[in-house]
Amino acid sequence: MITKEEAQKIAKLARLKFEEDTVEKFFTQLSTIMDMIDILNEIDCKDIEPLTSVCNMNARMREDAVTSSDLSSELLDNVSGNSAQLAKEVKYFITPKVVE
């Protein structure tokens, strides 16, 4: 069980801000989560072997191969409009401002 002060500290560390009416809901939900974690911590798992795969299949591995991964020219070929040439010269996309 955690206290309201601990819940408020956790919210502050996570940079969460709550209105007065939602603080109680946050505290209740966080307290429930912590209680569930406590229940899981009480389970004795020392005689249980770890599960590595649900369907017990082996992954087919491939050899690593060094390849060229510079796709910038191919991506910039898709730029259209007035900024296409400039985008190819500076090698980045030019977009309208979306955040003010």
Curated annotation (Swiss-Prot):
Gene Ontology BP annotations: glutaminyl-tRNAGln biosynthesis via transamidation; regulation of translational fidelity; translation
Entry-linked InterPro entries: Asp/Glu-ADT_sf_sub_c (IPR036113), GatC (IPR003837)
This enzyme's EC code(s): 6.3.5.-
GO molecular function: asparaginyl-tRNA synthase (glutamine-hydrolyzing) activity; ATP binding; glutaminyl-tRNA synthase (glutamine-hydrolyzing) activity
Family: Belongs to the GatC family.
General function of this protein: Allows the formation of correctly charged Asn-tRNA(Asn) or Gln-tRNA(Gln) through the transamidation of misacylated Asp-tRNA(Asn) or Glu-tRNA(Gln) in organisms which lack either or both of asparaginyl-tRNA or glutaminyl-tRNA synthetases. The reaction takes place in the presence of glutamine and ATP through an activated phospho-Asp-tRNA(Asn) or phospho-Glu-tRNA(Gln).
Assembly and oligomerization: Heterotrimer of A, B and C subunits.
Protein name: Glutamyl-tRNA(Gln) amidotransferase subunit C
Chain's gene name: gatC
